[in-house]
Amino acid sequence: MEQGSLQILIVMVVYMAAVIGIGIFFARRANADTEKFFLGGRSLGPWVSAMSAEASDMSGWLLMGLPGVAYWCGLADAFWTAAGLAVGTYINWLVVSKRLRRYSIAANNAITLPEFFSNRFHEKKKVIMGISAAFILVFFTVYAASCLVTCGKLFSTLFGAPYITMMLVGAAFVLIYTLLGGFLAESASDFMQAIVMVVVLVAVLTLGVANAGGLAAVFENVKDFPGFLEFFGIADPVTEGGVQLAVNGVPSFGARQDYGALSVASMLAWGLGYFGMPQVLLRFMAIRREDELKRARRVAMVWVVISLAAAIMIGIVGRALFPTALTTASEAENVFIYLSRSLLPAALAGLAMAGILAATISSSDSYLLIAASAFAKNAYQGIFKKNATDKEVMTLSRIMLPVITAIAIVIALDENSVIFTIVSFAWAGFGATFGPLVLFSLFWKRMTRAGAIAGMLSGGGMVFIWKLVIKPLGGIFGIYELLPAFIVSGIFIIVVSLLTIAPSKEIQDEFERVKKGA
């Protein structure tokens, strides 16, 4: 191993040891009961709640997927995606957070999202709980796979080891850490990792701009790439066998492609995903007091805006400094790694790599924990064995963690996977399956249990149908699957609710008490 790689490895090992230390510290508290293991006993402060929510939300996608899109095809796709995410983050904290925290307590102290949905409609047969748990298992397993792809790409790029070997190493570390501490450990470490992520993003960007000779020089270096710096146009890399061609050290681009209103709407639709994102919604439920949500929202927005802007600019700066270094869409996602290793001393590059590891851990532990809770708490205790003890539920949850990890590993075996693509599908799945359900559950008293079931099935099903059947038709049908699936889910909720018997007086009275803050 080269001396530089060894120094990077040492820094990353120290970082991982610190993360594991947090897990061990919180393990005893996490094991007390299921509320502490899955929701931290509703004890999160505003800073931890905000930054752990955003760190677990963004994942390695923030440091690899988003910069990779900017490097590969320019500003438009990355900018409009980030704009949608920023707006979605703000609205979610402003509109959903307080009502969801209050309602989750009123709904028999629900500690998971499926449990909240089921209790909201006073279910006896737990159909909503079962369906929502199944969708969570499916989409979070896909989401976890994207994190393992990030680990594999990171370690194989750094150390020249086989992708699969490095992906398995990353999976083992994340699994062990998640087994240790549960939600409290996850949230505490996510807070630390959110700090690491934003620091390394800003540091690498600043150094990259300085090495390029300033922002003006960055833009000068890429201005001749057609559509690269436009908001309503997009660059089109000329490829052969998926590899971008270059002439005399200059990357080849075709004619600028139009980026019209449909494309903008498609990318802005990413913001809709927040309303159905369990790892974010759980932080709303877990904050210790309602009056701390306003401060948490401000913290979250500052972090999100800085991080997204820095991630996009890293992709642009990377193309300006190293225009032909990364020649496929998959390789482009290594631009942050490439910049860090090229511009930073080995020890600082190790810290930057720890930033990617931080992003990956902060997301994958959330995904694994929520998926395991969906099976153990919601399916097993909620449906199959209602008298199961907390100890049984936590034991089963820990058994399910390696099972879910193994399935995610199978999905992540392809080293040519594009992180952005994997994340976008899982994001659409959660947004369309649960987003409309969350909004209508919190703000429409007339919504019925049948409407909730119809909304979940139609939204989740339409994501698959649009992605696999309709989207390949191209043209207007090429829009991001989240938008049509979200709309379809909302329509089904309204129509089916109005066609079925109104909720009982007990359910409606509970809704009014929550609305009034009683």
What residue ranges belong to the model's regions?
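Membrane-embedded helix-loop-helix hairpins and adjacent transmembrane boundary segments
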Residues: 1-518
